[in-house]
Amino acid sequence: MKKEVWRDVILSSVAFLALMWVAFFWAQKYFPMEQDTSAVAKVEEKKVAYLTFDDGPSKHTQEILDILEAYHVKATFFVTGSNPEYYDLIQKEDALGHAIGIHTFSHDYGKIYSSEKAYFEDVDKTNALIEKQTGHKVNILRFPGGTSNTVSRKYSSGIMSTLASAVTKKGYAYYDWNASNGDGNCYVGSDTLINTALKEIRDKKEVMILMHDG
């Protein structure tokens, strides 16, 4: 993704946060560092937004952390092992009070969705990385593509149902999303990203919004 486009993505995230906190007075909740799976709590008569970032850490993560810090906002980062030079940012995310979740080490659909064994080998590798950086393992995760993705069918029929059940039995809580700002498309500007986010959160009392830092 071109640097200037990523800058738009980051700025759109700032605008989104400002809109939530200033214009709508939303209450933002997040997963605590202890990774308590009961953290997704209802807040009566208030809208709740859970800000989540996938695919990092990367060269863009530090700027996102700076923005979140400026607005006193916490988020959840579902990390991968794709960029070893930025592993230290996992420790920084944790130290700043953000939550860390597993998004798989490789993010390789053909590999992780080929079998249950392959998926958990990748998950374990990611959790080992998180433990090395933060001193503790985590028990929250997000499947690449989400639980309803259809790409996985090419590699193993019914694998998502199998994995959703298996991760629960192993004590993990998995989280999809019900809104996105569309930043997976690197050819859209910040205005489009903001409008997409606002459209998707409309009429939702509890929002789990998907964004990317990698």
Predicted regions and their residues:
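Terminal accessory/targeting
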Residues: 1-50, 66-75, 178, 191, ...
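Intrinsically disordered, low-complexity segments enriched in small/polar residues
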Residues: 28, 48, 96, 153, ...
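Active-site beta->alpha N-cap acidic-glycine motif
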Residues: 30-140
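Catalytic domains of cell-wall/extracellular-matrix polysaccharide-remodeling enzymes
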Residues: 85, 107-214
